[in-house]
């Protein structure tokens, strides 16, 4: 078991949360149900150290630090959140993505690594997208769709103790919401999504677990403002998870061009 520490230099084993499994001809996301055709997701840990961070992520003020995110906020957020999948690699990849502009969405880089045309589930249909920015160190990717999908979510910052919620999809493509709390802002350093040395990312340490398929999902505060993007759990089920701070999203947005990025490697 890995024990989580918040002191500088504490080493954590993180588990990426996109669901992966053997590809099938149906193109459906892998199921986590215990059936003869179910697949087991790959959970390659990365060695990561964390240090407290006070770097601001936005000028949007944080929400109240008490209570839970209201159901009305969760419902409004849900309209901008979609499941995403791809079958280009040896394993199916399933995660969550959300709108930051009518035709731009954010997800985790490990969800779409090696995927040329990520497929979004939007309502009862499907929408193709292309990867227009990709950073294996911050574990973020930005997708563009040919059509506008709706109203984007605002982004801002959170402080320790803020009540937040994850709005995402599970590995079966079913909607989920989880109430969490921001423990502290950290600097997570270590390997990138490919296991190579990286400079790290500004992240949030969260009290509460997340699950397979949740990667790329937005962490929202009581006003519906996105304060982080979920990317990992601690190995061992200790009730701690991690989200990339939105300041990293703003950095990646500056790299978005009119054309898709060159093909990325599968993990």
Write out the residue ranges for each language-model feature.
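Positively charged n-region of N-terminal signal peptides that target proteins for export
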Residues: 1-6
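Bacterial N-terminal signal peptides
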Residues: 10-19
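Bacterial signal peptide processing site
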Residues: 21-26
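Extracellular mucin-like PTS domains
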Residues: 31-64
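A conserved glycine-rich beta-strand in the N-terminal activation segment of trypsin-fold
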Residues: 67-71, 80-102, 108, 126-128, ...
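Active-site region of chymotrypsin-like
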Residues: 77-84, 141-151, 176-266
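A generic structural motif
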Residues: 85-87, 121, 167-169, 220, ...
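Conserved active-site neighborhood of the chymotrypsin/trypsin-like protease fold
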Residues: 90-94, 101-176, 260-264
């Amino acid at each position: 078991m890995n024990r989580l520490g918040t002191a500088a230099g504490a080493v954590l084993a993180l588990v990426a949360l996109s669901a992966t499994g053997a590809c099938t001809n149906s193109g459906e996301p892998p199921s986590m149900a215990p059936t003869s055709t179910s697949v087991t997701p790959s959970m390659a840990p990365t060695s990561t150290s964390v240090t407290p961070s006070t770097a601001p992520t936005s000028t949007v003020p944080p929400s109240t630090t008490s209570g839970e995110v209201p159901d009305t906020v969760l419902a409004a957020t849900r309209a901008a959140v979609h499941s995403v999948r791809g079958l280009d690699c040896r394993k199916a990849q399933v995660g969550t993505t959300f709108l930051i502009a009518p035709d731009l969405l954010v997800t985790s880089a490990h969800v779409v690594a090696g995927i040329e045309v990520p497929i979004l589930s939007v309502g009862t249909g499907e929408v193709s997208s292309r990867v227009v920015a990709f950073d294996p160190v911050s574990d973020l990717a930005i997708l563009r769709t040919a059509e506008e999908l709706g109203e984007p979510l605002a982004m801002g910052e959170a402080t320790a103790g803020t009540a937040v919620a994850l709005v995402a999809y599970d590995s079966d493509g079913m909607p989920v919401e989880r109430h969490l709390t921001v423990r502290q802002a950290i600097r997570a350093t270590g390997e990138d999504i490919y296991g190579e040395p990286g400079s790290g990312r500004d992240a949030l340490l969260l009290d509460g677990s997340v699950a397979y398929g949740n990667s790329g999902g937005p962490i929202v505060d009581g006003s519906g403002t996105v304060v982080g993007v979920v990317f990992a759990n601690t190995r061992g089920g200790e009730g701690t998870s991690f989200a990339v701070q939105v300041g990293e999203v703003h950095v990646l947005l500056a790299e978005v061009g009119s054309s898709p990025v060159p093909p990325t490697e599968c993990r």
